[in-house]
Amino acid sequence: MSKGKNIAILLVVAIGAFYGGSLAEFQFGAFAPDWTKSLLFYTAPKSNVDYRTLDEVFTTIQQHYVKPDASGVTLTEGAAAGMVNALGDQFSRYLTPDEYRANQSFLSGQFAGIGASVQQKTDQIVLVSIMPGTPAEKAGLKAGDVVTAVDGQSTKGWTADDAVSHIRGKAGTTVKLQVSRNGQTLSFDITRENINVPSVATHVFNNRVLYVRIFEFGGRTATEFDQALRDNLKGSVNMIVLDLRDNPGGYVDAANDVISEFVSQGTSTILVSRGGKEEVKKVTGTGRAFGNRLVVLLNENSASASEITAGAIKDHGRAQLVGVKSFGKGSVQEDFPLRDGDLHLTIAIWLTPNHHSIDKAGITPDTTVTLANAQDEYAVDRTPNDFSKDTQLTAALALLGG
C-alpha cells in the first residue's frame, strides 16, 4: 500500500496495522493485515552474520552518549524495529509487548480507547470512521476530521501508528485532540473507555434484503456472521447486501468462514509462501446462503481479509461488487512471539481463486459508485432507517430490486 494510505483503528479503539504502512489496521501498526491464527515460537538457525557491530554501537552509546540515562531496553527495541524496517515491507514490524497486547485486544473485540479509526493520507491523519456509542462519537468527532495535534503535539509527519500510540491509553484517562473541519480548528477533550464492539451489524430493508456489515475479521466474526444469517434469512428476506467498506481486514480463517457462507465448493484463496509453495484454502461447504442473491460493497479502505472475501466471491460469480476500488493489500502476516515482544512478519502473498494478485492494485467493482462525502455512508448502528445519502448502498439495493 502506498504510504499515503495508512489506516489504524485507535486502540484507542484501536485497530492498527490493519496496520502496516498504510491502513494501519490497529495499533496494529499502520494497517490490520491478514493474520494467520497460529502463533509460532521460533528458534533461529545458525548464521554467518557478525553481530559485533551492533554490540559495538550499543556499548559506545552506553559509554559516550551525552545523556547517560539511555535505556538499554529502548535501544534494544529500536535495534529490533530497525532490523525489520530494513526489509522495506510496510506490513512487517517489531511490536513491543504493549503493542502486541493491544493488537490482540482489538481482534477480540475488547479494548480501551476512544472508538475511532484513522487513516494516513499524505501528510495528514484523518478520522475514517467513528464507532457508535463510543467516546469519540459522544465528544462530537466526525468522519473526515483531520487530526492536527494530540495533547498539544503536532501530528505533522506522523504515521497512522504514531497516531495510535499517542491517542490510545488506559480507560479513564483523557486525551486532547485538535482537528480541522471545513476550515475550522476544533478541540476535544476525550476520556478513554473500555470498548466492546461486535464485528457484525445487521438491518433488514423492506422485509426483503438483509444488510450485513462486517467491521473487521476478528475472532468472533464467523460466529456472529453465521448467527446473523440464521436469525434473518427467513420468510420473504432472501437477498443480501454485504458491506465491507472501511474494513481493514483481520484473520484469514475468518474470511474463509464468511466466503463459505456463500460459496458451496472450491477455493477461497491461495497463499503463496517462501519459495513459491502454494497452500490452497477451500471453503467449508456448510454455508447458509449458497443461493441467495448478493451484492458486496467495497471502498478504498476495504483491505486485506476484506479483499480476500470480495475476491473469492467475485471469482466464483456469486455477487456483484459495488463501490470504488479497494485498498490493495495482497500479503499475509504471521505473529512470531519473542522473548520480549512480537515479530509481525509477512510470510506469504495471497491470490484469488483465479490466481489474481490484487496487491497494490485493489479490486475494481463491477459497478463504480462514489460517495459525495464520507459522512454520507450508512451508519447501521446509529441511523438504521436512514440511508438516503448513501449512493453506494442505494445502488446495491437497486441491483437487487429491494
What is the role of each PLM region?
Residues 62-126, 174-176, 180-189, 197-202, ...:
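Extended, small/polar residue-biased N-terminal targeting/export presequences
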Residues 339-349:
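Short acidic, Pro/Gly- and aromatic-enriched capping/linker segments at domain boundaries
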Residues 113, 117-131, 208-213, 288, ...:
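PDZ/PDZ-like groove recognition
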Residues 128, 137-143, 151-154, 159-336:
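Cleft-lining beta-strand/loop regions that shape enzyme active-site pockets
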Residues 358, 368-402:
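Conserved functional hotspot residues or short segments at active or partner-binding sites
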Residues 2-91:
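Terminal targeting/pro-maturation regions of precursor/exported proteins
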Residues 108-150:
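Glycine-rich active-site/cofactor-binding loop and its immediate structural neighborhood
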